Design a protein with these regions (language model features):
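Cofactor-binding loop segments of dinucleotide-utilizing enzymes, especially the Rossmann-like FAD-
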Residues: 9, 40, 89, 203, ...
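Radical SAM enzyme core and accessory elements
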Residues: 3-6, 28, 32-37, 47-48, ...
Length: 653
């Protein structure tokens, strides 16, 4: 009896590691070994234990860093470094990466569908083993897979369409048209309890000449249309669903196959819409499904791609306009079919970013995209919370009413994207809270209006401006590369406030004057927000130096007018102003007097009248009046300090 550790890297994923579950079943129920499953690392109780064998699964290539960490961990807890095994998607697609970095690790590429793959006694075909759902209990306190109450299985293997961007032809090169799952489902029921849903991982089930047999078997297993399931924990009856998780090929969907799919508790029917060139084929497939009684459908919309071949076709690299039109087609189909069939038809769209199979860091940018657009789209998808785009009103609010508006949103500063929409009262919000939020909202609308006005006025300079923001990195250095003053002003909207403050350090007065003129005269709200940020924040004095030298008393007075004088603790910015004035060798105001004001206030040496007078003097940079008030109240301040010290001594005694 051996000690076996199954390890999944510490990434977030929706589905449990099916390969490890099969390996666990073999070791636990056929080899009678002790098996433990961990995600990332083992709990503290197992830290000192050494294992006879460790299996590490792999997923996507862009998860290489987490995978590498898991393999390093495996080698640290195994007795013999030659007894670490890996496999899965990354390990199959990039075996040289495993070999180069982990020469002692045994890499099982492809499927475990041959006798003796793991080199163990009694090993036949691990790929057909029952899944050991029991291993999920090992990490129940640490991680729960979003999809866990389901049978995970295959009824076919492979695909055969040979799409250039797809890994299936490498992972599953041979097409197997039919795999019965009845016995494996029965074993799961007997050993681990029945499951609510049936999640089929087939890559191209519609290609199978045994399609009718597959549908019949699924129905016989209790997943016919309208099927229900008694939840063992609650005793309540709930709907069951079938999910061909890897999608249905629109090119292979016929009226007969759609009717047969309509006999299942299918939700959703996943139909890929990878290229705008496939629009008519996609629309035909959606209509067939809807007219066959399937009410919930979804699609993956591949974007950020290159020129591809697949399914006997050639495809051009997609554009942002293409993505918008594909989403729009699905929204229009929802309305069309809902009206035609007189019941709700839902189509959820999931934009899916293309990443080359060899990309280890998820940083690929397609030929017709740029980093700015990709980041903006990611931000725009946040409200969907991974549930897809299905509402027509939400679609137009978030993605625009036209492809031109969509592309404009992609070019918009990321922070601005969150400012769009309508103002509405929030639940349990007081009138005062709403008024304060409305004030900020109104300011944000001014920002949006100013940015939009300038962006729409770009004309022939639009492509040039997009080239300046395309890398999604905004700097003073890039600002200097821009020649046109109007483009420079628009570019300022992409600056963070720290970057805007840094721009005041420019030695070129002409370049600096463009900034000063724009934020103080043309769009003073930008200056106002910069000042508030300085007054309310905790910025080091070095960040204020450029603005202090350039704007002098104007900057200092603006900051002092936004300081909160109602408390007893001096704001952080006061000390920064003292330091920056000393560094700049300038004499605008004796900011130490402000420290004196807060010290006097702390001990109660200032009445309301003198408080108002000194605050007014400070805000107007009236150093003489400030000094005079502090001098007048000095004796009272001294008496308060003595009384406070005496009180403290008595208390200590």
């Amino acid at each position: 009896m051996a000690d076996i550790l199954l390890l999944e890297p510490g990434y977030s994923n929706k589905y449990p590691p099916i390969g490890l579950m099969k390996i666990s079943y073999f070791h636990k129920y056929i080899h009678h070994d002790y098996v433990r499953f961990a995600k990332g690392e083992l709990p503290e109780a197992f830290r000192e234990k050494k294992w006879d064998r460790v299996y590490v699964t792999t997923l996507f290539t862009f998860e290489w860093e987490r995978t590498k960490k898991a393999l390093e961990y495996a080698l640290s807890v195994v007795k013999d470094p030659h007894q670490v095994y890996t496999g899965g998607i990354l390990a199959t697609l990039m075996p040289e990466l495993i070999a180069e970095n982990f020469p002692t690790v045994k890499n099982n590429t492809g499927l475990l569908n041959r006798k003796g793959t793991l080199g163990l006694e009694h090993e036949e075909c691990v790929d057909t083993m029952t899944l050991d759902y029991g291993i999920l209990d090992d990490i129940a306190d640490q991680y729960v897979y979003p999809a866990h109450d389901a049978y995970f299985t295959y009824m076919t293997r492979g695909c055969g369409m040979k799409c250039q961007f797809c890994a299936v032809q490498t992972l599953e090169p041979e097409y197997i048209p039919f795999i019965s799952i009845t016995e494996s489902i029965k074993r799961v029921d007997e050993q681990f309890g029945s499951k609510k849903d049936l999640l089929l991982m087939d890559n191209n089930v519609l290609r199978s000449p045994h399609f009718d047999e597959i549908i019949d078997e699924i129905k016989a297993l209790g997943f016919q249309k309208g099927a229900t399931y008694i939840n063992p924990k609650t005793g309540k009856s709930v709907q069951r669903f079938v999910d061909f998780n890897q999608g249905l090929d629109a090119f292979l969907l016929t009226p007969h196959k759609a009717e047969r799919l309509g006999e299942l508790a299918l939700r959703p029917a996943r139909i890929a819409f990878d290229h705008i060139e496939d629009a008519e084929t996609y629309k035909k497939a959606i209509r067939l499904c809807a007219r066959s009684g399937i009410t919930h459908m979804s699609n993956y919309l591949l974007y950020n791609g290159e020129d591809f071949t697949g399914k006997g076709h050639s495809y051009h690299a997609d554009t942002p306009d293409d993505l918008y039109e594909r989403m729009r087609i699905s929204m229009d189909l929802c309305e069309e079919l809902t009206a035609e069939l007189n019941h709700k038809v839902a189509i959820f769209s999931f934009p899916m970013r293309y990443i080359p199979l060899s990309d280890l860091k998820r940083g690929f940018v397609g030929a017709r995209w740029n980093a700015k657009y990709l980041r903006a789209l990611q931000r725009m998808l946040i409200p969907t919370q991974g549930k897809g785009v299905s509402s027509h009103s939400f679609f137009e609010a978030d993605f625009g009413k036209s492809s031109e508006e969509f592309v404009m949103y992609l070019a918009m500063p990321e922070e601005h994207l969150g400012w769009r929409g309508h103002f509405a009262k929030r639940k349990n919000e007081s009138d005062a809270e709403m008024a304060e939020r409305k004030k900020t909202w109104d300011e944000n609308q001014q920002y949006l209006g100013e940015w939009k006005r300038r962006f729409l006025a770009l004309g022939d300079d639009k492509d040039k401006f997009i080239s300046y923001i395309g890398n999604n990195s905004y700097s003073v250095e890039r600002y200097l590369e821009i020649k046109e003053s109007e483009l420079k002003k628009l570019y300022l909207h992409y600056f963070t406030i720290p970057t805007l403050l840094k721009s005041f350090l420019l030695e070129n007065e002409t370049e600096k004057n463009i900034i000063v003129e724009y934020i103080t005269q043309e769009f003073p709200l930008m200056y106002e927000r910069m000042i508030r940020y300085v007054a309310e924040g905790k910025l080091p004095y070095s960040m204020l130096e450029g603005a202090f030298r350039t704007l002098g008393a104007t900057f200092a007075q603006s900051v002092l007018q936004h300081i909160d004088y109602t408390g007893t603790e001096e704001p952080f910015v006061v000390n920064s102003l003292i330091k920056v004035q000393k560094k700049a060798r300038m004499s605008i105001f004796k900011f130490e007097y402000i420290q004196g004001y807060f010290l006097y206030k702390r001990v109660g040496a200032l009445d309301r009248k003198s408080t108002n007078a000194i605050v007014d003097a400070i805000k107007n940079l009236d150093e003489g009046k400030t000094r005079s008030i502090l001098a007048d109240k000095f004796e009272k301040f001294k008496a308060k300090m003595i009384a406070q010290a005496t009180e403290n001594e008595v208390g200590a005694a």
